[in-house]
């Protein structure tokens, strides 16, 4: 049985799972997924190695859960940013979340450490980001007539791909990613 999506019977379990996943994320960014050790994750999370195994049956399960955790963080950030806004303001909020996630990633670090793993992670992230943005674009169109000649899926894909391209090819100007992601969405720079 895989425990990639650990059962959470209480907030302590959720908090501990988050601590473990946060520790794993920091270590993956520091040393890469191949060198990730469950012992190091346990030490950084402040738990015993057997505790890690109560939540994740293997390193692969932990890495899989880490990808799902990052998507949940992205989705939660989208939900918070778009709360109480409609139309184009909703799109601006969503695009700014994408830009913030790109800005928060150490540029190319994982790509330098493990290109295959980084490519796999981005290949998994692209359809999830595209789907999330497509839903936003459809909501925007229903709310205040946000009109574009572009098919929502194509526009969402362009926004997501622009964001991911900045992870692969970081710009020396830290504000460039946000400007270009907003431009891909047809929004003025911020």
Where are the regions a protein language model picked out?
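Amphipathic alpha-helical packing segments from all-alpha helical-bundle domains
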Residues: 75, 118-157
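Basic, helix-initiating cap at the start of DNA-binding domains
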Residues: 1-44, 61-64
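Hydrophobic alpha-helical connector segments
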Residues: 65, 79-104, 118, 155-156
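Short amphipathic alpha-helix in the helical subdomain of ABC transporter nucleotide-binding domains
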Residues: 13-17, 151-156, 160, 174-178
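Amphipathic C-terminal alpha-helical segment
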Residues: 100-104, 139, 157-176, 186-190
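Short hydrophobic clusters on alpha-helical segments that form packing/core surfaces
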Residues: 20-28, 70, 74, 78, ...
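Short hydrophobic/aromatic patch on the recognition helix
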Residues: 45-56
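Helical hydrophobic small-molecule/effector-binding pocket
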Residues: 88-113, 123-128, 138
């Amino acid at each position: 049985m895989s425990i990639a999506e650990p059962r959470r019977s209480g907030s302590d379990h959720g908090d501990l799972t988050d601590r473990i996943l946060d520790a794993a994320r920091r270590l993956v960014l520091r040393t890469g997924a191949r060198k990730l050790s469950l012992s190091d994750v346990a030490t950084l999370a402040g738990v015993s190695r057997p505790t890690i195994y109560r939540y994740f049956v293997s390193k692969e399960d932990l890495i899989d859960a880490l990808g799902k955790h990052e998507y949940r963080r992205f989705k939660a950030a989208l939900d918070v940013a778009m709360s109480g806004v409609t139309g184009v303001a909703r799109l601006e909020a969503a695009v700014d979340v994408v830009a913030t996630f790109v800005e928060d990633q150490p540029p190319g670090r994982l790509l330098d450490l493990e290109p295959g793993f980084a490519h796999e992670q981005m290949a998994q992230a692209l359809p999830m980001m595209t789907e999330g943005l497509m839903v936003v674009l459809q909501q925007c169109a229903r709310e205040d007539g946000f009109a574009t000649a572009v098919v929502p899926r194509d526009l969402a894909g362009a926004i997501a791909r622009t964001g991911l391209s900045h992870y692969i090819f970081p710009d020396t100007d830290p504000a460039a990613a946000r400007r270009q992601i907003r431009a891909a969405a047809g929004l003025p720079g911020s």
